[in-house]
A protein has these predicted regions:
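Acidic, proline/glycine-enriched N-terminal capping motif
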Residues: 1-70
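Acidic, low-complexity central loop/insert segments
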Residues: 21, 29, 74-118
Length: 118
């Protein structure tokens, strides 16, 4: 997950900065469910998400193995065992979750197109 090296996104941003154009950068929405959803999210993000009550959210970040920030997100606690993660790189978040979940009871999927986000 080398988010900061996304060459396509960087090229798009530079084109907009140097000219005129339309730039749509919608966050992805990832749904995380399962008995161990909180446990896995606690491994991935730096904030204590156990303190986020249902119906509330937390701005947080994830770090790589060197302690460098690789992404910042908003984690929304929708219900017991149900979280939504607002993330710019949803397709890259899914393998990151898989890498850290081990044998945990968790399922993650992109639900961006089920909801309009602006």
């Amino acid at each position: 997950m080398l988010f900061k090296e996304d060459k396509v996104a960087r090229a798009d941003a530079e084109a907009i900065r140097k000219g005129i154009g339309f730039y749509r950068w919608t966050h992805d929405l990832v749904e995380v469910t399962g008995r161990d959803a909180l446990e896995v999210l606690q491994k991935i993000y730096i904030s204590d998400l156990s303190k986020v009550p249902v119906g509330k959210s937390k701005y947080t970040a994830s770090l790589d193995e060197n302690g460098e920030i690789i992404d910042d997100v908003i984690v929304m606690h929708m219900a017991d065992g149900l979280y939504w993660v607002s993330d710019l790189y949803g397709p890259r978040l899914l393998p990151w979750i898989d890498r850290h979940k081990g044998d945990a009871d968790i399922h993650a999927k992109i639900i961006t197109y089920d909801w309009d986000m602006y």
